């Protein structure tokens, strides 16, 4: 998020709720954390272009199918006139719609809670704060369902 730290999250594709949070230093690539973001029940995982090649890693789970986004430059190079390229572009739009669910908790933390920048207090302390913030974002996202169940 800020000062060379990244928050990697695993979220449910249907509900958008965060189930896994990993805090790493800024120089750790996304693909390194990819398989640790899975909770074990997934058969399909969707990631952005930073996760390309994840299925080839030694820690990759064999029973998980990864759908990883195309690099932006390759997507721009697709020709809309060719039927095959148009189908590939449509598939990329579907993947982007699923990935948007993962980005929504970041929006809740930054816009609704105001945590755009964080003071770096150490990896463990900042990761603990991220875990708390994502738990609160989960509560915020299911607030209407919880209130409806109340009465």
Predicted region positions:
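Polybasic low-complexity intrinsically disordered regions
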Residues: 1-62, 71, 131-137, 145
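A generic short-segment signal for beta-strand/edge and adjacent turn/coil regions
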Residues: 13-16, 75-77, 104, 151
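Helix-centered, glycine/charged polyanion-binding patches within enzymatic domains
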Residues: 43-44, 49-128
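Compositionally biased amphipathic helical and low-complexity segments enriched in hydrophobic
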Residues: 79, 124, 134-137, 147
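A short, flexible helix-boundary coil/loop motif
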Residues: 144-151
